[in-house]
Amino acid sequence: MRIREANPEDAEALAWLSGQLGYPATAEATARRLREIIAHPVGAVYVAEMRDRTIAGTAHVLAEYSMMDEPGAYLAGLIVDESCRSQGIGSALLRAAETWAREHGLTRMRVNSNVIRERAHRFYLREGYVENKRQAVFFKPLT
């Protein structure tokens, strides 16, 4: 396995992974989003590419700037293919995201995880993260 930055050719695999986590997306929409991320580099998207060149996971990290805290990083997504979990892929992707954050002078990493994803919570705790708070999330379309 190797961890590398994602590119638009990974869109189909990234859409598949996103769907596994309950966020269905088309390859076209995923490719468009990835091109936007690459064009506006406030973060990075990594993939775990297996020896057979299949994509087994992805991580998306962003820089966060706030008046309330020092600059930090936000792990916007971490997905490992259901058939490949518990093989160290998530840990490797998380390390890549943390390395990106450190290289960009960021001193902390924030992760949100749905309250029903208890397996993910155990993973983050094992990786040294601590639960900070639980909160409601609000959304409003702007179009």
Name each model feature, range by range.
Residues 1-2:
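Extreme N-terminal starter segment of soluble prokaryotic enzymes
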Residues 5-71, 76, 94-95, 132:
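Acetyl-CoA-dependent GNAT
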Residues 6, 78-80, 113:
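Hydrophobic adenine-recognition pocket in adenosine-nucleotide-binding enzymes
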Residues 80, 86-99, 122, 126:
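Conserved acetyl-CoA-binding loop-helix of GNAT-fold acetyltransferases
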Residues 94, 101-113:
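Conserved GNAT acetyl-CoA-binding A-motif
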Residues 111-120, 139-142:
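Conserved beta-strand-loop-alpha-helix junction that forms the acyl-donor binding cleft
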Residues 125-134:
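Conserved acetyl-CoA-binding loop of GNAT-fold acetyltransferases
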